[in-house]
Amino acid sequence: MDSISSPSTSSSASSTPKLISEKCLVCFQPSHGNHFGVDSCRACAAFFRRVFVTHKQQFPCREGDNKCTPDEWGRWSCKRCRSDKCFALGMKPDNIQRDRDRFIFSDNFRDDRKRKTSESIVPLSVERFVGKQLVTTYTSTGSGKNIEYITFFDLTPIIKDADYILKRIPKLEKSVKVKSSLEQLAFGLQEVRKEQLFESVPELRKIGKMETWDNWVKGMRRAGEWIMHFEEFRQLEQEEKMVILKCMWHLFIRLERISMTAEMRRMKLCDDKEFIYGTEQRINYDTLEIDRDWFSEATDREVRSFIGPLPRWFCETIIDALMELRPSDVELSFMLCNLCFHLTGQKLGGRIQEITDRLQDVLANDLHKYYLAKDKYSRYSYRLTKLLSLNRQYKNDLEIRRQGIFLANTLNIFRVKLSHPEMFQFSC
């Protein structure tokens, strides 16, 4: 009886379960559980996954002394010191429990993963890139006129229009103002899509110079109006806002159109070979005619050999993945901002990269709260990983398309001059 009521020290030590700390060891806020081997909150766990598992980036210390700490609310302003803290406490990427999401056990998961991996392989040769044997007549394309360019675009009107938009504060109802920045962006996405036709969308059979210019003008307006729903972005200096918008606008309109195409295909409002090119236009891959006279003297066959098949140019693999994932407007807004801000910061660096990193942190925290508000016990790592993997897939596709454009420019195939070429950093 005494032995039962007074167990030995050794047996007690071996049978006592390990208690979970009430405080997150990284930010000292309430802990959610043991993540990556350390007792932490879900926000810090999501930060570790996002930075070191997904992006695997290295960041400089904001203060320069590697001694930054969280504020009284547990918020870190320095990614470097926060990540160092995670590692110092013993967080490791190999502690990720990848078998906890029920989605992993779907019948098609492994086959889908293999397919996505094979599709992301960069072509090893020019022939493999264009998908056919290259012709050898590029040295004598078109009329042979030795001119620098065929068409010149003065983008000043578009920039002036954007400058005006960036000075306007969108009207938000009180019910929207109290929402998070990410939810306000989702509301902004709904606003810029109000002009979208969903039924009986007219088919655009030919894309020429005027159609291209019109697409740029409307695209810049929609990108500017959308991003101005981001409160932290509105607080930036006008010059900083313009620099960021000029770099990300074209990327935004491509991704937004890709997601709209996925949504309309899922609703059976357009065919598998159709792409929603504009709010009032759709194109068909089989019947679309490209007017080349304004940008090249090459033949249609030669131009298409560089840009590749239209389904690849319009990112069919990402459209299919979005149809399967069915992201909400909040998730889609996060995905758009994550890719736009990441590529913009990576391209421009310096002060702009610091700004885009800070903006991404704001939205990442908002996404975390959004998922918890839907279900505080949900494991949202699957959906977040899928969203970010789509962004990585887009960057891979972007690099492949840019290889074709680079080769075409080397051979002087495309002859268009822009007054502000920096506006097409990610135009492919």
From Swiss-Prot:
Source taxon at top rank: Eukaryota
Classification via CDD domains: NR_DBD_HNF4A (cd06960)
Zinc finger (NR C4-type) residue numbers: 24-44, 61-86
Keyword terms, alphabetized: DNA-binding, Metal-binding, Nucleus, Receptor, Transcription, Transcription regulation, Zinc, Zinc-finger
UniProt xrefs under SUPFAM superfamilies: Glucocorticoid receptor-like (DNA-binding domain), Nuclear receptor ligand-binding domain
Annotated localization: Nucleus
One Gene Ontology cellular component annotation held by this UniProt entry: nucleus
Family (UniProt): Belongs to the nuclear hormone receptor family.
Name of the protein in question: Nuclear hormone receptor family member nhr-44
Organism of provenance: Caenorhabditis elegans
Organismal lineage: Eukaryota, Metazoa, Ecdysozoa, Nematoda, Chromadorea
